[in-house]
Amino acid sequence: VGAGPSGLSAAIKLKQLAEKNGREISVCVVEKGSEAGAHSLAGAIIDPISLNELIPDWKEKGAPLTRTVTKDRVVFLTEKKAFNLPITPNFDNHANYIASLGEVVRWLAEQAENLGVEIYPGFAAAEVLYHEDGSVKGIATGNMGVGKDGEPTDSFQPGMELWAQQTIFAEGCRGSLSKQVIEQFKLDQNSEPQTYGLGIKEIWEVPSEKHQPGLVMHSAGWPLDSKTYGGSFIYHFDDNKVAVGFVVGLDYQNPYLSPFEEFQRF
């Protein structure tokens, strides 16, 4: 469930294992977006270690990973100054790549389909199906062609049930079915609650003299106050393009704070 990096990688790995062991299996991926990658909006830093294992010849197969990270900077901002901070291991992106996650996902979808994976875009998974013993049986997709009033239109198509020996939930952050499964099986028992943030990203085209291909910069501090969790990222990739993003933790206390307005100040 979900044609993102995790779901497609799982589908590819299953097909690879089936081929290695001489078994015929059907692998189906349902994706609510109009195409694979439609909801993958991040301008991402990608560590290729997992891709090296999954598809060792990814370079020959044209994976959209071309811009390596050449320099890391972490800064603390005030309204008028920027202070360089030490690079901690979690911010060391040496040998990683700056990439569009949407492009990477579309490429992974092509690799999956080449292996025989069936991908169904435009189908939102709506319900988890269970066996009588309580184990997961599969999922049901939502009805299509329903009007604003909730009534079927002329193009109505009922949802379909997909039964499987194994169901993998790869919906990403706050997936609707994942929440059902977490509640059903108490998967969050004795666990710390998840934290969430609201991120805003834009792609800028900058003059060539200001473009530093491969530069990755993260910041904390201004324009947020000391009580508000968040920060920014600036990634210089190809063609004078820069991904500029700003993230604010959703636990901010000031009810008048607008993450978008803070992004504009930044």
Q: Locations of the language-model features?
A:
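Residues forming the flavin
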Residues: 1-266
